[in-house]
């Protein structure tokens, strides 16, 4: 019986050792560091200047939508690049699979576009105002 690890076994051992190394460093640092919080340490630091306002700033949700779309297409490139390097060996069926993969992502982009998530300046909705009722008793009578 062969005692060596398979190709995936090497990857799993490397991954496990990486996780143990990072977790060990994190736990060691957490146990050795002093933890004495005070208001001065918890305050916002702005290069020696007095802090103006809060450090908590609300970001517009559109930034996150654009970042999410970028990440989706960035991951698409990560998946398609290895496919492109071995395209001749995989044949036409792999081309069809890659086109379906890209098509699904393009459909998602088209959906976001139609929904208006890619519009940076959105039009304000035109909400009709309700007509005002004449002043009188609550039951509507004027007498």
Swiss-Prot record:
Subcellular location(s) per record: Cell inner membrane
What EC class does the entry list?
A: translocase
Tell me which EC number(s) this protein carries.
Answer: 7.1.1.-
Q: Name one GO molecular function term.
A: NADH:ubiquinone reductase (non-electrogenic) activity
Catalyzed chemical reaction(s): a quinone + NADH + 5 H(+)(in) = a quinol + NAD(+) + 4 H(+)(out)
What sections of the sequence does the record tag as coiled-coil? Answer: none
- Indicate the family of this protein: Belongs to the complex I subunit 3 family.
PANTHER family (alphabetical)? NADH-UBIQUINONE OXIDOREDUCTASE CHAIN 3
Cited function: NDH-1 shuttles electrons from NADH, via FMN and iron-sulfur (Fe-S) centers, to quinones in the respiratory chain. The immediate electron acceptor for the enzyme in this species is believed to be a menaquinone. Couples the redox reaction to proton translocation (for every two electrons transferred, four hydrogen ions are translocated across the cytoplasmic membrane), and thus conserves the redox energy in a proton gradient.
Protein name from the UniProt record: NADH-quinone oxidoreductase subunit A
């Amino acid at each position: 019986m062969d005692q060596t690890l398979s190709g995936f076994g090497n990857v799993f051992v490397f991954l496990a050792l990486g996780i143990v190394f990072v977790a060990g460093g994190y736990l060691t640092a957490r146990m050795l560091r002093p933890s004495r919080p005070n208001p001065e340490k918890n305050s916002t630091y702005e290069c020696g200047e007095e802090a103006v306002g809060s450090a908590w700033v609300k970001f517009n949700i559109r930034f996150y939508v654009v970042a999410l779309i970028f990440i989706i297409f960035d991951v698409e490139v990560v998946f398609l690049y290895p496919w492109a390097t071995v395209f001749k060996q995989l044949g036409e069926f792999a081309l069809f699979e890659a086109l379906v993969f890209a098509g699904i992502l393009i459909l998602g982009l088209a959906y976001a576009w139609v929904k208006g998530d890619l519009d940076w300046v959105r039009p304000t909705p035109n909400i009709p105002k309700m007509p005002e009722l004449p002043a009188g008793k609550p039951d509507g009578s004027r007498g």
